Amino acid sequence: MKRILLFVLTNVAVVAVLGIVASLLGVNRYLTASGLDLGSLLGFALVIGFGGAIISLLISKPMAKWTTGVRIISQPQNVDEAWIVETVRKLADTAGIGMPEVGIFDGAPNAFATGAFKNSALVAVSTGLLQGMTREEIEAVIGHEVAHVANGDMVTMALIQGVMNTFVVFLSRVIAFAIDGFLRKGDERSSGPGIGYMITTVVLDIVLGFAAAIVVAWFSRHREFRADAGAAKLMNRKQPMINALARLGGMTPGELPKSMAAMGIAGGIGKLFSTHPPIEERIAALQNAPL
């Protein structure tokens, strides 16, 4: 749950900052000057909602490097690092994408891919993964991450998050306007949004943001099945990915920051907020999927 919480808070924080800046610029007063202007509110919600998602996408790679302490392999220092870089290169070529940055981070078994663009992504694996898996299994995990990049999952999830952000911003302000109007009923001296509007907006942005995260996590779980199948296709065989998943099922997966959880190989523990399906479901789906 810690990973999911950070993922939600990162997105909510960006949207909240944009909302506060808009309030300071007088946008709320404009939207409610003569009753709630739903058309203008929808435009405002689209700008804030997709603005927050796009900003989160654009800063995803530097944020990943900072939060995980990943060490970029610019020049391999040993045989293992050289093998990792060459494996990423081979799989990226097969997938038809540009060579990603390659990195290693300390921690329990996990891996992730991130970045705003297919041809300038980052693929990183943990030291725990490298120590606990065979090279064939590691290659399958790397293939899973490369498949995320090739499938455009970072952009897809950002667009989904943008839609959900728009819903949150729009609905929270409609409800806040109604509550504020009820609280100030009969107060003809006041104009523009009151304190009730401000407080309700902030609270609902957070509450609805968590509800939206459940929807985003549901989409993420479906993308995981595609990435598993993508890894099998890149290697032209299913068994390495099946073996890697089975081994992960017997390990304690490492925690990733929530902002990148959907691009990791190991999932969270909460069913509603989990960005990854259960291991047994992923294995069964891969076994039944066409190669």
From Swiss-Prot:
Binds 1 zinc ion per subunit. One of its GO terms (molecular function) is metalloendopeptidase activity. The keyword Signal does not apply. One of its GO terms (biological process) is proteolysis. Zn(2+) binds at H144, H148, E224. The active site is at E145. Its EC number is 3.4.24.-. Keywords: Cell inner membrane, Cell membrane, Hydrolase, Membrane, Metal-binding, Metalloprotease, Protease, Transmembrane, Transmembrane helix, Zinc. It is found in: Cell inner membrane. The chain crosses the membrane at residues 4-24, 39-59, 159-179, 199-219. It holds the Pfam family Peptidase_M48. Its cofactor is Zn(2+). It comes from the Bacteria. GO terms for cellular component: plasma membrane. Belongs to the peptidase M48B family. This is Protease HtpX homolog.
